[in-house]
């Protein structure tokens, strides 16, 4: 559903379980298909098909509000 950077780890949140991996957000971003996942903040990568709602400031996935960084505005509209 989404990936959150936590210092030198990433937290991978899925429908059923959360995982922690020791890698950078950039490393995991390079492994993901760009048509399915987008980085919307320096600390967050999201699965586009899991977006429940969004506005100019944040995306909602699994009832969690994820901020959209200033440099990433417009990515959601272009991707959907």
Q: Positions of the model-derived regions?
A:
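Tandem repeat protein-protein interaction scaffolds
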Residues: 79-80
């Amino acid at each position: 559903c989404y990936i959150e950077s936590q210092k030198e780890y990433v937290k991978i949140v899925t429908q059923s379980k959360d995982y922690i991996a020791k890698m950078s957000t950039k490393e995991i971003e390079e492994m993901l298909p760009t048509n399915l996942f987008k980085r919307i903040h320096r600390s967050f990568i999201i699965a586009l098909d899991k977006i429940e709602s969004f506005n100019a400031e944040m995306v909602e996935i699994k009832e969690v509000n994820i901020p959209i960084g200033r440099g990433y505005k417009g990515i959601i509209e272009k991707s959907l």
